[in-house]
């Protein structure tokens, strides 16, 4: 059985559109895989006939297979009874069917790999990208069918391994694991190509729509049949006679016929006596607007009441930025602040004079204190003066 060639190899650009191999009927309970009656064992010569690949591509494929393919699974030599040495016919037939299914799946995945490389080669216009998305969806459906066959083959191989020798199962497990890895790699590449094609088709679709808009604008730039401004058509806008008078845009209190409209003053406020805006009082809208204005005025009073404690706190201890904001440059300083500045100036001069006069008056005091504190001895004789 041939392992998968490296995914990074380049193959000729001929498209491969051959149908998938016929799926096999799995009989896991009986321990065998029954091939379809019309199906035969796939071989490298059948690859060239089914895929339609050129001879140099098949040469590369054969060289790759000879370099990377493991040896065939041992049939009669490794599956013998330990007591009598007779080969187990049931196990041998299961391994033969498993090997044939493995070859068929390898060819199927190889064909899907070629088709995926065909789709990955290059992207052209938006139409080509859209067609490739359709081809990719068909390829994805075929790959799902192949993945189901691989899963069934793995399940059958696990059941067969329970009745075979450990050495034979080791080689079988290695081959089946390679098939699963190849399947996962193709799925991953297919998902990457799907995301690339979708993003590319969206970009090309936007560019195509932009080109169509530019073509339409370019066609409409030239003068029409009726001249530069086009053919004349009756306007759908209303004439001045059909326009209605809007009281919101009235200036001077005049109605639609130029007559003076009598205005009704609004209700006075219970707190400050303010009267709201005047209205004609002829419709329901005027009454509603008066009531709404009165409610807004009362809400403003309520907000002022809530703000008064905060304003008092700010007036008691104003911060430096607030005091700076309150000063107006164009207005001179009030006269009440001048005595305060004079008082601070006199206080400063008084302190300076006191500091100058204190050292002069403190010289004598310090001298008396020093004399009083100077220690001296007083000698007193009890029996008189000593003899000379």
From Swiss-Prot:
Residues 1-339 are cytoplasmic. PANTHER family: NESPRIN-4, PTHR21640. Belongs to the nesprin family. Residues 60-92 are annotated as: Disordered. The chain crosses the membrane at residues 340-360. The KASH domain, which contains a transmembrane domain, mediates the nuclear envelope targeting and is involved in the binding to SUN1 and SUN2 through recognition of their SUN domains. GO terms for cellular component: meiotic nuclear membrane microtubule tethering complex; nuclear outer membrane. The keyword Transmembrane helix applies. Keywords: Disulfide bond, Membrane, Nucleus, Transmembrane, Transmembrane helix. One of its GO terms (biological process) is establishment of epithelial cell apical/basal polarity. It is a single-pass type IV membrane protein. It is found in: Nucleus outer membrane. Signal peptide: none annotated. Residues 331-388 form the KASH domain. Residues 78-92 have a biased composition (Basic and acidic residues). InterPro entries: KASH, SYNE4. Disruption phenotype: Mice are born at the expected Mendelian rate and look overtly normal. In the cochlea, outer hair cells form, but appear to degenerate as hearing matures. Inner hair cells remain intact. Hearing loss is already detected at P15 and progresses at all frequencies by P60. Core component of LINC complexes which are composed of inner nuclear membrane SUN domain-containing proteins coupled to outer nuclear membrane KASH domain-containing nesprins. SUN and KASH domain-containing proteins seem to bind each other promiscuously; however, differentially expression of LINC complex constituents can give rise to specific assemblies. Probably part of a SUN1-containing LINC complex. Interacts with kinesins KIF5B and KLC1. It comes from the Eukaryota. Expressed in secretory epithelial cells, such as those found in exocrine pancreas, bulbourethral gland, mammary gland and salivary gland (at protein level). Also expressed in the cochlea, where it is restricted primarily to the 3 rows of outer hair cells and 1 row of inner hair cells (at protein level). Not detected in other cells of the cochlea, including Deiter's cells and pillar cells, nor in liver and kidney (at protein level). This is Nesprin-4. Residues 361-388 are perinuclear space. SUPFAM superfamilies: Spectrin repeat.
């Amino acid at each position: 059985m041939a392992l998968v060639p490296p995914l990074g190899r380049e193959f000729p650009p001929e498209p491969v559109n051959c149908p998938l191999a016929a799926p096999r009927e799995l009989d896991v309970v009986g321990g065998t895989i029954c091939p379809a009656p019309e199906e035969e064992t796939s071989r490298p010569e059948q690859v060239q006939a089914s895929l339609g690949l050129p001879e140099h591509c098949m040469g590369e494929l054969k060289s790759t297979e000879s370099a990377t393919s493991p040896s065939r699974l041992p049939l009669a030599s490794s599956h013998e009874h330990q007591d009598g040495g007779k080969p187990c016919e049931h196990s041998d037939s299961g391994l033969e069917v498993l090997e044939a299914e493995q070859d068929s799946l390898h060819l199927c995945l190889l064909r899907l790999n070629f088709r995926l490389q065909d789709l990955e080669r290059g992207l052209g216009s938006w139409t080509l990208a859209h067609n490739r998305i359709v081809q990719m969806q068909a390829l994805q459906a075929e790959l799902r069918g192949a993945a189901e066959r691989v899963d069934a083959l793995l399940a059958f191989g696990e059941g067969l391994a329970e009745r075979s020798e450990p050495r034979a199962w080791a080689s079988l497990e290695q081959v089946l694991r390679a098939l699963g890895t190849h399947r996962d790699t193709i799925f991953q590449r297919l998902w990457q190509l799907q995301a690339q094609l979708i993003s590319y088709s969206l970009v090309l679709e936007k560019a195509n729509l932009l080109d169509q808009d530019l073509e339409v604008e370019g066609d409409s730039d030239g003068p029409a049949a009726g001249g530069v401004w086009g053919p004349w058509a009756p306007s759908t806008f209303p004439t001045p006679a059909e326009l209605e008078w809007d009281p919101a845009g009235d200036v001077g209190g005049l109605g639609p016929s130029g007559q003076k409209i009598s205005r009704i003053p609004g209700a006075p406020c219970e707190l400050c006596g303010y009267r709201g805006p005047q209205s004609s009082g002829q419709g329901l809208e005027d009454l509603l607007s008066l009531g709404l204005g009165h409610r807004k005025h009362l809400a403003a009073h309520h907000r002022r009441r809530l703000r008064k404690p905060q304003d008092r706190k700010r007036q008691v201890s104003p911060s430096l930025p607030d005091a700076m904001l309150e000063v107006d440059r164009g207005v001179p300083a009030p006269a009440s602040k001048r005595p305060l500045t004079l008082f601070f100036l006199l206080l400063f001069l008084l302190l300076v004079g006191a500091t100058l006069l204190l050292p002069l008056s403190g010289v004598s005091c310090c001298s008396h204190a020093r004399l009083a504190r100077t220690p001296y001895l007083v000698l007193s004789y009890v029996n008189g003066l000593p003899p000379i």
